Swiss-Prot record:
It comes from the Bacteria. It is a peripheral membrane protein. Its EC number is 7.2.2.7. Keywords: ATP-binding, Cell inner membrane, Cell membrane, Ion transport, Iron, Iron transport, Membrane, Nucleotide-binding, Translocase, Transport. Part of the ABC transporter complex FbpABC involved in Fe(3+) ions import. Responsible for energy coupling to the transport system. The lineage of its organism: Bacteria, Fusobacteriati, Fusobacteriota, Fusobacteriia, Fusobacteriales. SMART domains: AAA. Residues 5-235 form the ABC transporter domain. The complex is composed of two ATP-binding proteins (FbpC), two transmembrane proteins (FbpB) and a solute-binding protein (FbpA). This is Fe(3+) ions import ATP-binding protein FbpC.
Length: 371
């Protein structure tokens, strides 16, 4: 109940407008794979091409060794969950879940076994006689997921399935979806624009922009060593600063120097762009004045962490995230000195098109960098 999905040189266009150009991708059997990117990047278009709902202008799509370009969507054995749930309002929970099995002429005995199994798996068995209007958004999404999985598809496709839920329920549902996917082991392709959601559920993520894959890898790799500046700014928060590179010495904010021993492209020198995550700054408690000099503009207390908004001597604005202290918050106008571990800094070419450091793990086939 799982397949490898392979895409070779896919193209999708609407008239003269190219949505996806020469995209290749290899999704592993049983993998939870997420297409992540801003609106209009082509992620839903690609998902619909896999499903058979959009035409394929060029390229080949495979489930294992079987080419599916011309295969009717109904014969691809996919389960699909949409943003708007798409469950039938006139049917009970149980009737919604059994719908696909009835269409496949499954025997009543087998149908009952499978329906009971998935109602329990989704923790909605106590609601089996309820109509959808009497369910919460999370419960309706569980019904949609049960209906998609009960037919034992080879692939599960999910298009922004949590976007209509409130923040707390989204966290609960993404945890449930990941647990269910792990227990079943089905190849899952998930579309979202929410980077935190993507990192929480995915085995691997393809970060997309303008129909191209910018970075493909595990969430940790993408967050810690993004392939280019777009990926760095799209995945989580980061501070983007100007820098100057001379050999292994990186100068930040005009004065602060860091010695780097992990430069891969040693031909790069002069102006570069630097990315530092807010949580990677360390405020020098001893005020030794050998760090980056900054001035606190404001702060926001968020329980576990306090977010400080500050500016450097260069005038560049930054955000600093520190673990909250019981006794104090740094006041507005205070002068602080910041340090950062050299391995926590990312350095990009001046145009932001690529990371020049070692340790960038990018599985993208025919990698296209930001222009």
């Amino acid at each position: 109940m799982s397949v490898n999905i392979k895409i070779e040189n896919a193209q999708k266009r609407y008239g003269d407008n190219i949505i996806i150009e020469n995209l290749s991708l290899d999704i592993k059997q049983g993998e939870f794979f997420t297409l992540l990117g801003p609106s209009g990047c082509g992620k839903t278009t690609l998902l619909r091409m896999i499903a058979g709902f959009n035409s394929i202008e060029k390229g080949n799509f495979y489930f294992n060794e079987k080419r599916i370009n011309d295969l009717d969507p109904a014969k691809r054995n996919i389960g699909m969950v949409f943003q708007n749930y798409a469950i039938f309002p006139h049917l009970t929970v149980e009737q919604n879940v059994e719908f696909g099995l009835k269409n496949r002429k499954v025997s009543k005995e087998e149908m009952k076994i499978e329906i009971d199994k998935f109602l329990k798996l989704m923790q909605i068995d106590e609601y089996k006689d309820r109509m959808p209007e009497r369910l919460s958004g999370g419960q309706q999404q569980r019904v949609a997921l049960a209906r998609a999985l009960v037919i034992k598809p080879d692939v599960l496709l999910m298009d922004e399935p949590l976007s209509n839920l409130d923040a707390k329920l989204r966290v609960e549902m993404r945890t449930a979806i990941k647990e269910i996917q792990n227990s079943i082991g089905i190849t899952t392709v998930y579309v979202t624009h929410d980077q935190e959601e993507a990192m929480a559920v995915s085995d691997r993520i393809a970060v997309m922009k303008d129909g191209e894959i910018q970075h493909l890898g595990q969430p940790k790799d993408i967050y810690q060593r993004p392939a280019n500046l777009f990926v760095a700014t799209f995945i989580g928060k980061t501070n983007v600063l100007k820098g100057n590179l001379n050999g292994s010495i990186l100068k930040v904010a005009g004065k602060y120097e860091v010695s780097l021993n992990n430069i891969k492209d040693k031909n790069i020198k002069g102006n570069v762009v630097i990315s530092i995550r807010p949580e990677e700054f360390v405020i020098d408690e001893n005020q030794t004045k050998d760090g980056m000099r900054a001035f606190i503009d404001s702060s926001v207390f968020l329980g576990l962490n306090t977010h400080y908004f500050a500016h450097l001597e260069s005038g560049e604005k930054i955000e600093i995230v520190q673990e909250s202290k019981i006794d104090s918050i740094i006041p507005k106008g205070a002068e602080v000195y910041l340090k950062v571990k050299q391995d926590k800094i990312n350095v990009f070419t001046e145009d932001g098109s690529r990371n020049i450091l070692e340790g960038v793990n990018n599985d993208a086939i025919g990698v296209a960098y930001v222009k």
